[in-house]
């Protein structure tokens, strides 16, 4: 299956030099381009991903306390040095959108605010997916 071939190509390209790579997201704040991958500063609404479990062990402590949805914890990990990438593989997957999100969202009164690490970034800075 081509999806698995594409994911394997990321493993072949990065080896052990990454913590996470996402293949689907609704929005992201790009950083730099590295080979076929886009390094990100912030990413949200991820559905398909590759995690280097051994490299992620050093970041486990930053998941606690779980004071935010796990998608929003990624920016904290990136701020601590985690190498997080995105590669658009949506042409190889089908996302079931027949149900509403089960994720609780908190009304904070700041419509353009989305990141603790980048509080001055606005939705205009975000690269949107699908």
Kindly give the residue locations of the regions a language model identified.
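An acidic/histidine-cluster motif and surrounding catalytic segment
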Residues: 2-130
